[in-house]
């Protein structure tokens, strides 16, 4: 079995009297989609904040790419290969899809303050951005203004932007949110194909998507890991069925 690409060991985070993550241990292996599910308030967002470096754990450790990154800032984790998409789309709506990806590439390369006009003149950069759009199925929409894209296309664009840094691990925070059935199915198919490029930690409420995609699933309830295992193990777990999947057990 391969060494985990990302692992946490007994992460604890408190907000006053609220224990948001209670000794959470989870890992993601290379080429794996590991889904993190749980009801609202389960601690998923707090856990992701600790993984990205936006929140510091009170105790516990985080390892990524063979290093202890518990106290590393966000930008250092990005440099190591940690990418993220957000629960709410973060594209620049007034710019084209190609501009969005080009700006993401140059930001990752350390040129965040170049003017957009300079970016548009950089043929090498724009070719790379076009390849990024082609990879997520948006090549034909390169010149479309982001605000004119469908919600599903904006999600694909955001993933293209996250992939601009060639991450080893991608954190996907509710990528199906707000999508219709057909858009969700297309994104599921795309994420399946993405597994060969990077591992993924998927935070998602769409159970059809979760069980279609995940190699393993971890269930959080009240900040604790209730269960972790394969799709079949989670489906059959009596506590999960009762507490989260909404089924009565006998």
Where are these regions (language model features)?
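Glycine-rich phosphate-binding loops of nucleotide-dependent enzymes
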Residues: 2-250
